[in-house]
Amino acid sequence: MWQLAAANMAAICVHTPLDIAEGAINTRLYDMLKGTLSLGEITGSPDGSGLGWTAESGEEFSAEELASILKETLGCPVVRFCKSDRPIRKIALCG
């Protein structure tokens, strides 16, 4: 940060209520993925303090399947993931 300030540059790191506001980043991610992943209702942290959401899928996915779906749906050239033998049903969103 000091180097940015010394060079008269600013940095914006937006991990704020913009993630959880109605119609904002998490909502857009959920809307893009809910049909493809058969997502149920979204839930936030129990005490309301977190910026992430979770949703249960009506289906199970392997890590490879989920990465492929995310890559295509979000238009990402690369999606990094860790292989696992456990099926994935709970999806976390944090814009």
Please place each PLM-identified region on the residue numbering.
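Hydrophobic structural segments
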Residues: 1-95
